[in-house]
């Protein structure tokens, strides 16, 4: 039997599911989120309560640039095949986490924030060349 690893400090859903870490299935939360109909969901939890892991799970579920069915195999969300067909890997996702932005001073924290935003811009730079309709452009203006 394969030894499972503890995911201490690992907040990447794909890494946890692919590399044999223990994972407590919270994928049912996706269905609850979708059924709530809320325009905005605010997650207020203390540090180290899985907020970034939850965001990573959502990104992997919705991201149109990926096919992540294998990551969700055996999880609660896959029991709802209609929901998965309609929502899974069907939408563009921009993922930005500030979990690594901290510092011993304002200047240090600002430098980390600038670095994080710079990396974010590099990852999604290709979007500058995407053709958009006027209506689509109005959403981001």
Where do the PLM segments sit?
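Phosphate-binding site recognition
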Residues: 1-141
């Amino acid at each position: 039997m394969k030894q499972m690893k503890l995911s201490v400090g690992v907040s990447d859903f794909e890494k946890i599911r692919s590399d044999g870490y223990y994972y407590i299935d919270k994928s049912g939360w996706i269905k609850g989120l979708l059924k709530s109909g809320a325009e905005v969901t605010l997650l207020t939890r203390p540090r180290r309560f899985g907020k970034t892991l939850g965001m990573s799970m959502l990104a992997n579920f919705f991201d149109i640039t990926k096919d992540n069915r294998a990551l969700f195999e055996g999880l609660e969300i896959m029991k709802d095949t209609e929901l998965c067909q309609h929502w899974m890997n069907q939408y563009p996702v921009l993922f930005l986490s500030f979990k690594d932005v901290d510092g011993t001073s304002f200047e240090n924290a600002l430098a980390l924030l600038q670095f994080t935003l710079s990396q974010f811009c590099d990852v999604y730079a290709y979007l500058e060349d995407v053709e958009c309709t006027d209506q689509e452009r109005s959403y981001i203006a």
